[in-house]
Every structure is written in C-alpha cells, then in structure tokens.
C-alpha cells in the first residue's frame, strides 16, 4: 500500500499589468483556493523570452501547472468544464 501523498504541483502564471484575462485567471484560481507564482513579463524581458520558449505563445496569461502547460484563460476554463483541471491542480493528472 502506497502511503505517499501526492504533492500539489506549483502553479506559475505569466501575466502583464493591463491584461484582463490575467485578472480573470487569478480570480478563478483564488476561487479554487489555489496559490500561484506570478511572473510579470511586462517588467522582465528575460521572463517574457522564457515564457515564449516554454509556451510557444506570446499572449498572456500563460498558465503552467507543474510541468503541464495549461495555456491561457480560455484553455484553463475549457479544462475546468471538461472536469480535467481539478485533478491536474490536485497533482493527480
């Protein structure tokens, strides 16, 4: 019997100050009692380059749960509606 608890994966969200979808994504994660690390790409050019390399996208937000690239706000909501986001947030996906 395996008694090792699955650790919740770290959530990293790449954002900018003027992004309304970033605010919506943060509000949604807050409603799910999640914590995340916010990386502001408008303040850090190196972080923007890293996001573009990892996500292969230039828009924000870009959301990562552990090693999984969720995508933007609409992508996260599609996962939620499909019942696949919560297991990912819990570390079970």
What is the predicted role of each segment?
Residues 53-59:
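Thiol/disulfide oxidoreductase modules built on the thioredoxin-like
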Residues 2-5, 61, 77:
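Short secondary-structure boundary/capping segments
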Residues 20, 45-46, 71:
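Short alpha-helical
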Residues 2, 48-52:
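Short secondary-structure transition/capping segments
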Residues 2-35:
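Local sequence-structure signature of Cys/Sec-based thiol-disulfide redox active-site neighborhoods
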Residues 65-93:
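Non-catalytic, surface beta->alpha helical segment in thiol-disulfide oxidoreductase systems
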Residues 35-48:
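Thiol-based oxidoreductase modules, predominantly thioredoxin-like and allied folds used
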């Amino acid at each position: 019997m395996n008694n090792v608890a699955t650790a919740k994966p770290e959530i990293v969200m790449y954002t900018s100050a003027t992004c309304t979808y970033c605010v919506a994504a943060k509000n949604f994660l807050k409603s799910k009692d999640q914590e995340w690390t916010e990386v502001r790409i408008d303040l850090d050019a190196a972080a923007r380059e890293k996001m573009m390399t990892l996500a292969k996208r230039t828009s924000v937000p870009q959301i990562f749960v552990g090693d999984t690239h969720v995508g933007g706000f609409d992508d996260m909501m599609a996962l939620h509606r499909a019942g696949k986001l919560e297991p990912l947030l819990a570390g079970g996906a």
